[in-house]
Amino acid sequence: MHTLRETAIRNVTSGENVVIYQPANLYDCVLGDNVFVGPFVEIQGNTRIGANSKIQSHTFICEYVTIGQRCFIGHGVMFANDLFRDGKPNADRASWGRIEIGDDVSIGSGATILAVSICDGVVIGAGSVLTKSITEKGGWAGNPARLLRRL
């Protein structure tokens, strides 16, 4: 016996000219004007995506993420705010971190973003892992990500 679960777009508030490719799971989130969401994307609750931002395929955006305007999120980016401090998932949402992405940020494919803040105008290299907040505009890459060049 198989259980088939369909993709869902539920309780999404969206602006004008939003494009969402199926299959996708989006719920309890806000999408600004001209947002693009590629296929196989999940955007969880209490998340806001700013106007003119693009979320490419196979990206997972957990709860409590804010993405600014004119941002680019590459293919397969993972946002994670439960750091498994006890070695297992924590169901207490109050303990989850928050992720804040400024305006004009570009995040390369395959990057992992933990509970951090990223200032405006940052470029994150593909495959990078962000473990600490970024307060300086520039190109960042690596595991853990570090500043490679000021912009």
Language-model segments: which ranges?
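C-terminal/domain-terminus segments
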Residues: G121-S133, G139
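Flexible, glycine/small-residue-enriched loop-and-beta-strand segment within the central core
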Residues: M1-I9, I20-L31, V35-I118, N143-L151
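Short coil/turn connectors at secondary-structure junctions
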Residues: G102, T135-E136
